[in-house]
Amino acid sequence: AAGECAPCSMVFQDARLVESASALDNVLVCADAHVDASSAAALLRLLVPGVDVDARMAELSGGQRRRVEIARALLCPGGAVILDEPFTGLDAAARDATTKVVLDLLDGRTLLLATHDIADAQALDISDIITL
């Protein structure tokens, strides 16, 4: 209806994870009813190769934790994905691989990226506008 806002998902600059939950449970927390655990686990394994999807957050490295947050944002329903410094803490290889997955899974949704690294914005290479 007119005036309604479409839902969006977000990766915050600071971690917003449920520490006592598994990586898989953190991803599923906002997924809609059409996302099953096996699909979420497959995305986690794509973004975080070798991850134990049942591992608690304290067992994961900072980069792994960051990619769990990105997986959650990509699985959440909505017309937009907001990423605030999403690649912080990722090494170059993980950053490149994660960027590719983000691009592959946007599926027509709007992406709003906040970053201090112009290379991140250029790597996503889908920008209509880049503001410095």
Q: What kind of region is each of these model predictions?
A:
Residues 56-60, 64:
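Conserved ABC ATPase signature
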Residues 37-52:
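Conserved ABC ATPase "signature" region
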Residues 84, 91:
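ABC-family nucleotide-binding domains
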Residues 70:
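Hydrophobic anchor residue at the start of the ABC signature
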